[in-house]
């Protein structure tokens, strides 16, 4: 007598697998949502701290310009690629047997990032005053000098922000959501703490 396949056990297994997958998606979405909310709140605190310690002065404008330029490069490169390209590519190699290829791809992207962005940073350091003038919108000469000085300090962040974007895509593909979800929140928290601790002694 031939045994009949146990479809009920297969259906039960499929249901449990689907339930686990949906629970994982819900958990990941919750972590990302909490990270975004905390980041927004800390962003508001950051702006309040800057206004409190420096007021509506040219110093705030100088800092805003110097900090936004690295963010422009991040949004243009790694920030824009994470959801569109990096996560799908990384996810296709996320299985344990493909981890070697995953590390090779990550290493290649980080190396490519250094090769492309290092000359950009160097040129930015050389022409910081000209860049500050282009994006300043009619600042005074003194504020323009401060902007150029701050820009030379913040330009290397172009490299680190894009590194963080690539590694965030890697962590998302490996289903590790906490660190990349709170990445922006930690960035804003760092600015808040530095403003509170060093505003009076170091200024902007």
Give the ranges of each region predicted by the language model.
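Membrane-embedded alpha-helical bundles of multi-pass transporters/translocases
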Residues: 2-204
């Amino acid at each position: 007598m031939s045994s009949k396949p146990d479809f009920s056990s297969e259906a039960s297994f499929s249901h449990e697998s689907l339930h686990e997958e949906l629970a994982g998606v819900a958990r990941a979405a919750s972590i990302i949502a909490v990270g975004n909310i905390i980041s927004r709140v800390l962003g508001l605190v950051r702006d309040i701290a800057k206004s409190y310690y420096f007021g509506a002065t040219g110093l705030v404008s100088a800092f805003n310009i110097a900090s936004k330029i690295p963010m422009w490069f991040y949004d243009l490169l790694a920030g824009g690629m994470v959801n569109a390209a990096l996560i799908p590519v990384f996810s296709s190699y996320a299985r344990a047997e493909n981890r070697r290829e995953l590390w090779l791809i990550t290493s290649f992207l980080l190396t490519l990032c250094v090769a492309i962005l290092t000359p950009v940073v160097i040129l930015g350091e050389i022409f910081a005053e000209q860049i500050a003038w282009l994006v300043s919108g009619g600042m005074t000469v003194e504020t323009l000098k401060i902007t150029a000085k701050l820009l030379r300090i913040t330009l290397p962040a172009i490299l680190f922000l894009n590194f963080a974007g690539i590694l965030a895509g890697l962590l998302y593909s490996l289903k590790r959501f906490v660190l990349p979800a709170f990445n922006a929140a930690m960035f804003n928290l760092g600015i808040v703490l530095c403003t509170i601790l060093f505003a009076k002694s170091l200024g902007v």
